[in-house]
């Protein structure tokens, strides 16, 4: 039986030319073109086993940036212990006396905070008397404009 050249058979299947190439074997003699240094060049960290893996910030022995530049600033422990309460959040409370305990009871101050400070943002519609709670100059003016007062 003669086969049609257009008939596809399993024994005729083969990958396209150039689709499957053998991996390049390096370091197998100078005749291969990739012997001796195996394409890694001469000496240096990249020629070594595990080479090229350098720590972030390593500058080749030069004093690194994080050691050349001076230390600046600090993280204030007072800021960590002081909670900011925005003035419009006070409207959630009933008008009258407001102290640290009342702010914590209304979940306006996290449990880790030791102090609270009122910061101006938004409008105040109720009359509040702040006791033992700090306030910014703008917040103080807004509280007094609404008929309240600040007693530190």
Curated annotation (Swiss-Prot):
Gly residues bias (residue ranges): 28-38
PROSITE patterns hit by this protein: RIBOSOMAL_L15
Entry keyword annotation includes ATP-binding: no
Chain residue ranges for the region called Disordered: 1-66
Function as written in the Swiss-Prot or TrEMBL entry: Binds to the 23S rRNA.
HAMAP family per the UniProt record, alphabetical: Ribosomal_uL15
Family: Belongs to the universal ribosomal protein uL15 family.
Designated name of the protein: Large ribosomal subunit protein uL15
Organism: Xanthomonas oryzae pv. oryzae (strain KACC10331 / KXO85)
Lineage, uppermost ranks: Bacteria, Pseudomonadati, Pseudomonadota, Gammaproteobacteria, Lysobacterales
């Amino acid at each position: 039986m003669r086969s049609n050249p257009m008939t596809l058979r399993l024994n005729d299947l083969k990958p396209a030319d150039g689709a499957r190439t053998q991996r390049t074997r390096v370091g197998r003699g100078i005749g291969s073109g990739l012997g001796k240094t195996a394409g890694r060049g001469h000496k240096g960290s990249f020629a070594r086993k595990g080479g090229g893996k350098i720590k972030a910030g390593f500058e080749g022995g030069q004093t690194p940036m994080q050691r050349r530049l001076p230390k600046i600033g600090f993280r204030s422990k007072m800021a960590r212990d002081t909670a900011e309460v925005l003035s419009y959040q006070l409207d959630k409370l009933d008008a009258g006396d407001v102290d640290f305990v009342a702010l914590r009871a209304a979940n306006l101050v996290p449990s880790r905070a030791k102090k609270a400070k009122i910061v101006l943002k938004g409008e105040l519609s109720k009359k509040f008397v702040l006791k033992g709670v700090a306030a910014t100059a703008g917040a103080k003016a807004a509280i007094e404009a609404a008929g309240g007062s600040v007693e530190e």
